[in-house]
Amino acid sequence: FLDRNFTVLAMTMPLVGMNNQPIVEIDGLGEIKLISHKQFGLLEEKNFNPMKLFVHPVQINLNFLEKEYNFKRYSMIGLSGGGWTTVVYSAIDERISDSFSVAGSAPFYLRVDDRDMGDYEQINIDLYRDVNYLELYVLSAYGDDRNHVQIFNKNDSCCFSGSGSGTYEFVIKDKISQLGKGNFQIFVDDTHNEH
C-alpha cells in the first residue's frame, strides 16, 4: 500500500502489541492485571461499557485524519479481532467506504465449535441484543459507493473458517439490493492453513 502512495494507519486490539496490559482496581475484587478480553466484563459499570475500548480509538484516529488531511476515501482492513472491529466500526461510521474483515466474525448460528465463540466483544449480549451479525454486515456494506468484503481462510488454524458463509451471503446481498446501494461479498481463501 505504501508503494502505491496510500497513507496507512495501523492499530492493534486492546491489550495486544504496543498496547499495555494495565493493572486496574475493581471494587470488591482488588487489583487485577488485564491480560485477556475475557476480563473486560469485570470493567462494566453504569457509566462505562468496555466495548468502547475497541471502537473509540478508531473514531479518534479517523477524526484526526479527517481534520488534518484531505483524503477522498477511507478503507479499513482487519485480521481476526481486527476483522471484528472492522465489521462493527464500518457498520456505525459511513466514512468507511471499503471494509475488509479477515477471519473476524460469523453469525451466532454458525458458531458450533468452541474456537469460533470468540472473546468478550464477540459475544457481548448488550450489543447483540440490539443488532445481530447479519445486521452488522448489512450496515457495513450499505451506502453510496460502500463495499464490505468478508475474507475467510478455509483451513484456518484458529477460527472462523468461513464454512457455512454461503448460508447468509445471499441474504445480505438481497437486503443490500432491496436497500438500493452498497455491495457485499464473501471470499473463502483455500491457499493456506494460516489464520
Model-derived segments and their meaning:
Residues 54-63, 135-142:
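Structured alpha-helical segments in the cores of large, soluble enzyme domains
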Residues 155-157, 181-195:
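Histidine-bearing beta->alpha loop at or near hydrolase active sites
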Residues 14-18, 81-83, 105-108, 154-158:
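Solvent-exposed loop/turn segments at secondary-structure junctions
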Residues 1-56:
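Cap/lid segment of the alpha/beta-hydrolase catalytic domain
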Residues 19-24, 88-89, 110-113, 161-163:
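Short, solvent-exposed loop/turn and secondary-structure capping segments
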Residues 59-120:
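Primarily recognizes the serine-hydrolase "nucleophile elbow" in alpha/beta-hydrolase
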Residues 4-8, 70-74, 93-98, 144-148, ...:
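Loop/turn elements at helix/coil->beta-strand transitions in domains of secreted/extracellular proteins
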Residues 98, 107-180:
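The feature captures the conserved acid-bearing segment of alpha/beta-hydrolase catalytic domains
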